[in-house]
């Protein structure tokens, strides 16, 4: 590697282009190692050719701040690097204000609570006191039944102090914990809560949670997310403006920094191998063509939410929505294999994943590289049981079109005889709702699960594949190959 007189800043891969660059280029001469790579700062590589002028505004560049890179084909490039500096370092060093616990103290003293309403559960975080998830049901006579779990409270002082002591030690050593929030590594202050409702899946040990407070100047202490990261252990992310006065907890935008790689005499403006890779990507990027049916205005029917968040219910996650992609089989072959049960849909984000094999079973599972696969049979298919169920329930739901015709918008199937439930001592059972979902990706499928009652589930499956077979449903909602 050859250096300019001003030295070399860190060369950081901030995206696919830079990852490709690192694979294509190698430093030449000098015998020194490249700077250490990190993902903290994103970069973008530009290939301006032999002649160009450095930007005079924005990030600062110097002509002598460069590296000479050589490809496997002996193509040479002079890559000029931006002078990336952190203007917050001095402010952090000089900060003498309150620590994060002291900044959050007004919130804890106010006895205030924050709420997040999901499709079934409501989450209540009373700051400095407890975390509760609950569901209210009104019965005949307006009697209200409350189904609730405490995910943690402040009675478990040992857990609380352990979390806070760890956070204080990290702050002193400048190791503030961070969490990936929408692609941005964001600093947070953790508050531990233990002594929650006993968890039957963990030998009745109490549930526990970590509340992660992150800075957001315009927030009002909202609950951003609730996730069950492992069985009966939760993470709750809270947005608060109170931490924003502390420089170490402020949200920092990461602007993309441009690197300019000039081609040296005898070299093309861009490496040959990189151009070949880009051409291959263009070939693979086949545009999706919408058919006439998909060009029609979308109906106003109720649509299941498509939120990528694992949400806990009872001792298990109950609303987990995720999008997966089916291999590019031909549509006819894919439908045939789906209806035969040989092609299964998989989905879910978080601890639990779901497998649905049409006419066979619904499984809930978790895979761990150390302990292997944990699987729960949620329901198995029996056509006679389903037909009996269909006599008392709606197996085929219609949508009325503007021209007065009816089309099938959803079918529901009953799968019973699952594994015995610890709470009810009865077999688990699930109602599978198959619904058409228009998408720019014709092979996408969304799978999610609800648990409105203990061990009685609803599995939602939405896909463009289902659009092609819904109208074949008979009076019992059973599907067949289209003509």
Swiss-Prot record:
Record keywords, A-Z: Disulfide bond, Endoplasmic reticulum, Glycoprotein, Repeat, Signal
Biological process terms in GO annotation: endoplasmic reticulum unfolded protein response; ERAD pathway; negative regulation of retrograde protein transport, ER to cytosol; retrograde protein transport, ER to cytosol
Gene that this sequence comes from: ERLEC1
GO annotation, cellular component aspect: endoplasmic reticulum lumen
Record's keyword annotation contains Metal-binding: no
Disulfide bridge map: 113-126, 199-232, 215-244, 344-357, 421-455, 436-467
Signal peptide from the UniProt entry: 1-33
Predominant subcellular localization, coarse grouping: endoplasmic reticulum
Organism placement in taxonomy: Eukaryota, Metazoa, Chordata, Craniata, Vertebrata
Post-translational modification: N-glycosylated.
Protein location: Endoplasmic reticulum lumen
Domain MRH positions: 111-246, 342-469
Tree of life domain: Eukaryota
Pfam families found in the cross-reference section: PRKCSH (PF07915)
Gene Ontology molecular functions: unfolded protein binding
Protein name per the record: Endoplasmic reticulum lectin 1
């Amino acid at each position: 590697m050859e250096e300019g007189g001003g030295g070399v800043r860190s060369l950081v891969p901030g995206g696919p282009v830079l990852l490709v660059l690192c694979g294509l280029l190698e430093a030449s001469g000098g015998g020194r190692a490249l700077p250490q790579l990190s993902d903290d700062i994103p970069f973008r590589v530009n290939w301006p050719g032999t002649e160009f002028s450095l930007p005079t505004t924005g990030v600062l560049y110097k002509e002598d701040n460069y590296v000479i890179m050589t490809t496997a084909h002996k193509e040479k490039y002079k890559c000029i690097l931006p002078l990336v500096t952190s203007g917050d370092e001095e402010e952090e060093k000089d900060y003498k204000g309150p620590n994060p616990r002291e900044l959050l103290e007004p919130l804890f003293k106010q006895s205030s609570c924050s709420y997040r309403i999901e499709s079934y559960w409501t989450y209540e975080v009373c700051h400095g006191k407890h975390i509760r998830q609950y569901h209210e049901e009104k019965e005949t006579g307006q009697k209200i039944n409350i189904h609730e779990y405490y995910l943690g409270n402040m009675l478990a002082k040992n857990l609380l102090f352990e979390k806070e002591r760890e956070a204080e030690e990290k702050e002193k050593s400048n190791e503030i914990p961070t969490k990936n929030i929408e692609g941005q590594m964001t600093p947070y202050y953790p508050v531990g809560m233990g002594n929650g409702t006993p968890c039957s899946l963990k030998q009745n040990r109490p549930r526990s949670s970590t509340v992660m407070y992150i800075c957001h100047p315009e927030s009002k202490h909202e609950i951003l997310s609730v996730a069950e990261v492992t069985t009966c252990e939760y993470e709750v992310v809270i947005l608060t403006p109170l931490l924003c006065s502390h420089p170490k907890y402020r949200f920092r935008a990461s602007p993309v920094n441009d690197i300019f790689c000039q081609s040296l005499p005898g070299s093309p403006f861009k490496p040959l191998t990189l151009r070949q890779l880009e051409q291959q990507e263009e070939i693979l990027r086949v545009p999706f063509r919408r058919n006439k049916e998909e060009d029609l205005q979308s109906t106003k029917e109720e649509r299941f939410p498509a939120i990528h968040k694992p949400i806990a219910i009872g001792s298990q996650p109950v609303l987990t929505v995720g999008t997966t992609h089916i291999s590019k089989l031909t549509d006819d072959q894919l439908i045939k294999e789906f209806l035969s049960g040989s092609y299964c849909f998989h989905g879910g984000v978080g601890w639990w994943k779901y497998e649905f094999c049409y006419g066979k079973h619904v499984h809930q599972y978790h895979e761990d590289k150390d302990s292997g696969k944990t699987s729960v049979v949620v329901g198995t298919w029996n056509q006679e049981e389903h037909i009996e169920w269909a006599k008392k329930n709606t197996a085929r739901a219609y949508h009325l079109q503007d021209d007065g015709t009816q089309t099938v918008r959803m079918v529901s199937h009953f799968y019973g005889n699952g594994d015995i439930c610890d709470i009810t001592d009865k077999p688990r059972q699930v109602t599978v709702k198959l619904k058409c979902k228009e998408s720019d990706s014709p092979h996408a499928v969304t799978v999610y699960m609800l648990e409105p009652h203990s061990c009685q589930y609803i599995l939602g499956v939405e896909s463009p594949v289902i659009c092609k077979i819904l109208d074949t449903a008979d009076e019992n909602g059973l599907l067949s190959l289209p003509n």
